[in-house]
Each structure stands twice: as C-alpha cells, then as structure tokens.
Amino acid sequence: DETKKVYPFDFAFTVTQKLSGRTVTVIWEVENTGEEDLYFSVGGHPAFMIPEQYDIVFNKDLRNHGETELEYVLIDPETAGVDAAHPRKLSLINGKIPYTRTLFDEDALIFDNTQVERVGVEVDGKPYVTLTCKGFPSVGVWSKPKADAPFVCLEPWIGRCDNVGFDGELKDK
C-alpha cells in the first residue's frame, strides 16, 4: 500500500458531511486500528467565493469590545516552515478586520494556541459565511497573495507544518 510506505501506521479516516438548511457540518474521525501510538495531523481546506469588499470576523465574543489583537505567524518562504520566533499582531476593531488587497501578501495568517474558535466573512455588516473551529489548535486564513482573488480560505487545523528549524521526530510535533 502506497500510504504505508510514507506513513507507517494502521488507521481509518472517515469524513462525514451533513447538510441541514444553510448549515454544513463536517466531521473527521481518525481511528487507530493498530497497536502502536498513532501520530497524525489533519486540516481542512475550505475555500469560499466572496465579493470584492468584505470583513473577516473572529470569535463572536470579541464583538463590541473595541480594539483587540490576535497573534499570528507566517510561513517562511525560504524554508516553508512556520516562523514562530517572530509572531505578529493583527489589530481588530469589534472582532473584525476589513479585507485589503495587501492582507495576504505574505501568505496565510496562521493563528495558533486555539485563539480562534470561530472565523467568518461579513459583507455589508451581515454574516456571509462562518466557520466554527472550537478546539482546533490552529486556524489558517488566506487568499492568493498579491492578487484580488475571488475567494478566501478559512482552514481549521489539528497540526500544521513544522516550525523553522524543527528536525525532531513525528511524535514530537
């Protein structure tokens, strides 16, 4: 089996998608079918077509709190690892930031440490799409860098690419 050559674990991975009204629920189930500890990461890659002007909205509890900040990290283009040694701050007003053409010029904004429980898009102050990601250690938000792409990706991750300089084992990720 090709997977076993690069990922030597016995497992079953099931994705269930349910549609109920205007809500899509996605359930990931990872089952260890072997005897050894199972080390894994999993993340979604949902992209949403959006209008030209929109706001990105974070965590419902940040609404009406004036100015707040979230910490994010970027992927180092030279190593393809996360530059966790140089976190940045994203300033929000009432839990949101307007999209600007330069927002994703340095690639994905990666929010670690379960800071983001909900992220979405508002258009003209009205909810357009919302992703609930409570319990996910990391969330990536991005669109095509240096372009006015007609989409935004809101990605929940259990695990992400390594930090710059990491050379440990899979079990240490």
Predicted features along the sequence, with ranges:
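Short acidic, glycine-rich loop/turn motifs
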Residues: E2, N32, V121-G125, P145
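Active-site pocket scaffolds in enzymes
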Residues: P127-K173
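Acidic, contiguous internal or C-terminal segments within carbohydrate-active enzymes
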Residues: E2-F40, G44-P46
